[in-house]
Design a protein with these regions (language model features):
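Conserved, well-ordered active-site substructure
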Residues: 472-474
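A short helix->loop->beta-strand "cap" motif at the edges of active sites that frequently abuts
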Residues: 177-179, 424-427
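Short, solvent-exposed amphipathic alpha-helical segments in soluble enzyme
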Residues: 417-421, 447, 515-516
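N-terminal localization/anchoring segments of enzymes in phospholipid and broader phosphate metabolism
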Residues: 1-388, 392, 396, 436, ...
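Helical hairpin unit composed of two closely spaced alpha helices linked by a short loop
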Residues: 407-426, 433, 438
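Short beta-strand/turn micro-motifs composed of small residues
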Residues: 185, 405, 432
Length: 550
């Protein structure tokens, strides 16, 4: 009896000590939240989580509460970023001279990224908009098979299914021609790829495969594992580059069990042969990302970067070869249709549907002499740069703002920019997919629809699949295009890349693309939206409280 009494006292004492310890840890974390979190909405959300979810809230904050990419990775990344700036500065380019044809507001917008990244506006680019997977695969394959010296690929998701297999085989064939091929993929986004036989196959064929931001039990303790490399970049011979929303996936196979339809993506092919251009800036971004993942000594980091960029400083002549590229695509398409091999010695399975490719080539011809600016963003390195650029662009709008995004979870500043633009008489259109692959994001996004509709923002829900494109067009001469979603994860956590396009013709093409999406969407009516049930509204608004953490 005495032993039972003593054990009861011990249990009570342990429980009291546990409660006191939990309170002290929670209090300590609240102090850290107040000190570390610069955004008020995030701080309030985390404090609510800490008190509402005992123990779980503490574990959650320890794992995901603060931006931490790891000391060694941050050190390597900062050194790589310095090399990126040094490259831009070494060219001694007068960006004011290059951007002299831009209006004052566009020049001011470009200065935001120039200050953060060192990359300004470059001219003499030829851009080709691609809006379906057939065209994107055909163009990438053509450039892989034509590459002479270097191929750099950086993607969030690599899914070795369908037409992606043909692309991976083309990479292996390229190394046999003496081409240096590097593939950098995110550890989480490409989880299935890194556990497949394709990594060994590629490495055996002398393709360099790099895992970006690898995760593991120990890494979970020392850094945040939800900071991901969300970039999508492809560079060939320092003259041809791609970026956009497209991952290395075949939409006929990818996430078919999610019941959201096929993923709808866009990509832009950029071509330039100038000594300094945005394609070489793309190559530098991917090269620095690769070098940040290596275990080489810090003193050798510059050598690693220079190994990829040694040809950046050679003089070259600007030649617009976009028409030759299109003729090459058409020639290969016709050869496949005739059962011929357009490139002897390379196996080309007849996987492409030619008709959509030809119609898209006619719909979106290449646009030459385009001025554009590459804007890479990453936590603790160039954080907030794309967010600041985007919000300022919306505030500067005079006629229209058209947004296409798969995920829309704004903060107060972005919401204010959109609602005040609509109240100023600017036509503001937001197009999001009706179905997304994240229920939490869907509910959080819906919570913002009512204030947007009340302000006069037009909202459309895309019906023909998961609209994954990320496009912002302002008026008729400025466009932001790339990998950035309209949510805080893209703005503050992920490694992203965007292009600011300063060209009326190219912006008109982007607007045409966006209006094609709108034709496949249903408008959201304010009256009908307000008549939803109390339960539906409550659920959206409850999830909205945690939107700063999504």
């Amino acid at each position: 009896m005495g032993l039972l009494l003593e054990w009861s006292i011990v249990k009570t004492l342990l429980l009291q000590l546990g409660v006191i310890a939990h309170f002290l840890v929670t209090l300590w974390l609240v102090v850290r939240v107040i000190q570390q979190q610069r955004r008020q909405s995030v701080a309030i959300a985390w404090i609510a989580v800490l008190f509402a979810l005992p123990v779980v809230g503490i574990i959650g904050y320890m794992l995901f509460g603060e931006i931490n990419i790891g000391h060694q990775y941050r050190k390597r990344s900062l050194m790589a970023q310095k090399l990126l700036r040094d490259f831009a500065n070494a060219q001694q380019i007068d960006f004011n001279e290059i951007s002299k044809n831009l209006d004052t507001e566009a020049r001011q917008l470009s200065n935001i990224a120039l200050l953060k990244t060192g990359l300004g506006v470059y001219d003499h680019h030829t851009l080709t908009l691609m809006t379906d997977a057939d065209h994107i695969f055909a163009s990438l394959l053509a450039d892989i098979r034509a590459a002479n010296t270097m191929i750099l690929l950086e993607f969030y998701i690599v899914s070795p299914q369908g037409r992606v297999i043909e692309l991976l085989e083309a990479l292996m064939a390229a190394t046999q021609r003496g081409v240096s091929v590097h593939l950098l993929a995110d550890s989480v986004g490409s989880h299935a790829f890194f556990r497949s036989q394709w990594v060994k196959k590629l490495k055996d064929a002398d393709v360099f495969v790099h895992e970006s931001l690898p995760v593991g039990l120990f890494k979970t303790i020392v850094k945040r594992i939800d900071i991901r490399n969300h970039r999508k970049l492809a560079i060939f011979d320092n003259c041809y580059g791609y970026t956009g929303s497209f991952n290395l996936i075949d939409p006929d196979f990818f996430k078919q069990d999610a019941h959201v339809g096929k993923w709808i993506d866009v990509m832009i092919r950029v071509e330039s042969h100038d000594t300094v251009n945005s394609v070489k800036a793309m190559a530098l971004v991917t090269t620095t990302d690769i070098s940040a993942e290596t275990n080489a000594n810090f003193s050798n980091l510059e050598k690693i970067v220079n190994r990829f960029t040694k040809s950046f400083y050679t003089q070259s002549l600007y030649i617009d070869t976009s028409k030759l590229h299109h003729r090459k695509l058409q020639h290969e398409a016709n050869a496949r249709g005739a059962g011929q091999n357009a490139n002897p010695g390379v196996t080309q399975p007849p996987l492409l549907n030619i008709l959509p490719l030809q119609s898209n080539l006619q719909a979106y011809p290449s646009v030459s002499q385009v001025s554009l600016q590459l804007i890479p963003s990453a936590p603790e390195l160039t954080e907030h740069v794309i967010y600041e650029t985007l919000v300022c662009a919306i505030f500067a709008a005079k006629k229209q703002v058209v947004i296409t995004t798969p995920y829309f979870v704004p903060d107060d500043a972005l919401l204010l920019a959109l609602t005040t633009a609509a109240k100023r008489g600017v036509k503001v259109i937001l197009n999001v997919p009706k179905k997304v692959d994240s229920l939490l994001v869907r509910f959080a996004s819906q919570a913002y629809f009512e204030p947007l509709l009340s302000a006069g923002v037009q909202i459309y829900l895309f019906n023909a699949g998961l609209l994954h494109a990320k496009i912002l067009c302002v008026d008729d001469d400025y466009c932001l295009f790339g990998t950035v979603n309209m949510d805080m994860r893209s703005f503050y956590l992920n490694m992203e890349v965007s292009m600011a396009i300063y060209n009326r013709t190219m912006t008109q093409q982007m607007l045409t693309c966006q209006h094609e999406y709108l034709r496949q969407s249903e408008p959201l009516q304010r009256d009908g939206w307000q008549q939803r049930s109390f339960g539906a509204k409550f659920l959206d608004n409850a999830i909205r409280l945690f939107s700063p953490l999504l």
